[in-house]
C-alpha cells in the first residue's frame, strides 16, 4: 500500500475490509480510502469509529453484498473515480465467494480500474491437475461437516487465466508467493492448499 501511494496512487479500495484499520494507519493527504463490506459490518464499524471520535474525512465506508451487488455500482455511488489509478485490495475474500460471484467481482473492479491500477488479491490454490469441485467438496465434508463456508479454490493457472480474462496481468507470474493454509486427506497423500498472494496491473480496461 505504501509503495502504491508513494508511486502516486490516490485511491485505495479495500474489498471485504471488515475492521481493518489501514485506512487510518496509512492515511495520506490527497488519498481517498474506500472500505467495502457487508451492510451490518459497515454499520457497526461506522458506529465504533464515531464513538472513538475518529476523523474519517478521507475514508468512505460503503456497504456491499458481494453475492448480489454490482461492485461497480457501489463504487460509483461511493464517489470512486474510475478515471484515476486505484489500488484494489482483496485479502481472504474470494475463498468465501461462489465462483460466479468472484467472476462478477473481478468484472466490477475491472470496470473501475483506470490505467495504472493495481489489484492485490489473496487466492486459495490447490495443486494443478486436481478437480476444483472435488477439492471444495472434500473441504466441506472434512473440515465443516457439510456446512462449509469455503467456495472458491482453484489451480494457480486457473487464477492467472481469470485475471487475464478481466484485463489484469499478474506481476512475476512465475514466482509464487504463498503460505500453506491447510492440508486435505485425499488419495495417497495429503493435498496442500495454499493462500497465494497475487498482485496484478491493468493491461486494458475491463
What annotation goes with each model-predicted range?
Residues 1-206:
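Alpha-helical subdomain
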Amino acid at each position: 500500500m505504501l509503495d502504491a501511494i508513494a508511486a502516486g496512487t490516490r485511491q485505495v479500495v479495500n474489498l471485504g475490509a471488515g475492521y481493518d484499520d489501514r485506512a487510518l494507519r496509512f492515511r495520506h493527504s490527497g488519498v481517498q480510502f474506500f472500505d467495502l463490506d457487508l451492510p451490518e459490518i459497515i454499520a457497526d464499524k461506522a458506529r465504533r469509529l464515531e464513538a472513538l471520535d475518529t476523523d474519517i474525512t478521507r475514508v468512505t465506508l460503503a456497504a456491499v453484498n458481494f453475492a448480489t451487488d454490482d461492485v461497480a455500482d457501489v463504487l460509483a455511488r461511493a464517489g470512486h473515480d474510475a478515471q484515476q489509478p486505484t489500488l484494489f485490495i482483496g485479502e481472504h475474500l474470494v475463498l468465501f465467494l461462489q465462483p460466479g460471484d468472484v467472476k462478477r467481482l473481478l468484472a466490477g473492479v475491472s470496470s473501475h480500474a483506470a490505467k495504472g491500477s493495481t489489484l492485490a488479491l489473496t487466492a486459495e490454490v490447490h495443486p494443478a491437475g486436481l478437480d476444483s469441485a472435488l477439492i471444495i467438496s472434500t473441504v466441506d465434508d472434512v473440515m465443516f461437516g457439510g456446512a462449509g463456508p469455503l467456495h472458491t479454490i482453484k489451480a494457480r493457472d486457473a487464477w492467472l487465466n481469470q485475471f487475464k480474462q478481466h484485463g489484469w496481468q499478474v506481476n512475476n507470474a512465475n514466482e509464487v508467493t504463498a503460505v500453506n493454509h491447510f492440508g486435505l486427506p485425499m488419495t495417497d497423500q495429503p493435498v496442500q492448499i495454499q493462500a497465494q498472494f497475487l498482485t496484478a496491473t491493468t493491461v486494458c480496461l475491463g
